[in-house]
Regions:
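Short alpha-helical segments and helix-capping/turn motifs at coil-helix boundaries
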Residues: 34-35, 64-69, 204-206
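Hydrophobic transmembrane alpha-helix bundles
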Residues: 30-40, 50, 118-128, 163-183
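Acidic, histidine-bearing metal-coordination/catalytic regions of metal-dependent phosphoesterases
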Residues: 1-52, 59-60
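Acidic, His/Gly-enriched loop-helix segments that form or flank divalent-metal centers
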Residues: 147-222
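Active-site neighborhood of phospho(di)ester-bond hydrolases with catalytic His/Asp-centered motifs
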Residues: 51-53, 80-86, 134-140, 189-192, ...
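Contiguous hydrophobic segments
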Residues: 10-33, 113-116, 128-133, 188-221
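Flexible, charged surface loops at secondary-structure boundaries
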Residues: 43-45, 74-77, 129-130, 182-184, ...
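Core catalytic region of metal-dependent phosphoesterases/phosphodiesterases
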Residues: 57-170
Length: 222
């Protein structure tokens, strides 16, 4: 067990220099949970806002859901009705599938997208009945497809976008451009916030960090 070198002056004991195996200790790490109590409001008459996000209307869809959305709006009876973008999908103007491809040839005409939006709005108003909240429409990236198409085809500038906007404006909707904030009592509504370069803030982690870090007010976005 021991290997010793003896002399009149010193002794070395081998057992002191045996390899010592490290002990591995695994302990469970529990991330602390910080709970912030919700603030209670002292308002006796709070402002009620009903938000419609990303409806993505297309001609081939069953649009009956908009009647029931309207019924829910009527029941809630909001002060404001806000659409935060992508009400219409506008696959007609999509650049993902080129027109000469098989998928591209299945894209609907622009007027079919506009007519489907008209039908969806009529069902929505039917469900809403006689209530008349203040209405606003924040354009989304799918509506932007239409404006980009017109921008690239000078001969039709305004021909389709004005028809589309009129569907909303004639019923009292205000319209804000893509990326612009619409404020209600200090709360901002937008389809997606844009960064300093004018690009969309996207991705799960980016949305969790950049939007919350850069915001100076509450934001509702789709």
């Amino acid at each position: 067990e021991k290997l010793a070198l003896s002399s009149s002056h010193w002794t070395i004991e081998w057992h002191r220099y045996k390899e010592v195996k490290p002990q591995i200790i695994i302990e469970e790490y529990k991330k602390p949970i910080i709970r912030i109590p919700a603030q209670s409001t002292t308002f006796t008459n709070p402002t009620k806002v009903f938000v419609i996000p990303d409806a993505h209307v297309s001609p081939e869809q069953d649009l009956e859901r908009f009647y029931w959305i309207g019924k829910q709006i009527k029941e809630y009876n909001p002060d404001y009705l806000v659409c935060i973008g992508d009400f219409c999908s506008f696959d007609s103007c999509s650049t993902f599938d080129k027109n000469h491809t098989v998928k591209g040839q299945k894209k609907p005409p622009i007027l079919a997208d506009i007519n489907a939006t008209r039908d969806a709005l009529e069902l929505l108003y039917e469900g809403m009945g006689d209530i008349n909240p203040q209405k606003h429409y924040c354009l989304g990236n799918h509506e932007l497809r239409l404006y980009k198409y017109e921008d690239e085809h000078k001969e039709v500038v305004g021909a389709f976008s004005q028809q589309y906007e009129t569907l909303f404006r004639k019923k009292g909707w205000g319209i804000s451009e893509y990326g612009d904030f619409y404020f209600i009592k200090g709360v901002a509504f937008v389809h997606v916030p844009l960064n300093e370069m004018g690009r969309e803030i996207g991705g799960k982690m980016a949305e969790a960090s950049q939007v919350s870090n850069a915001a100076t007010h509450d934001i509702v976005y789709g």
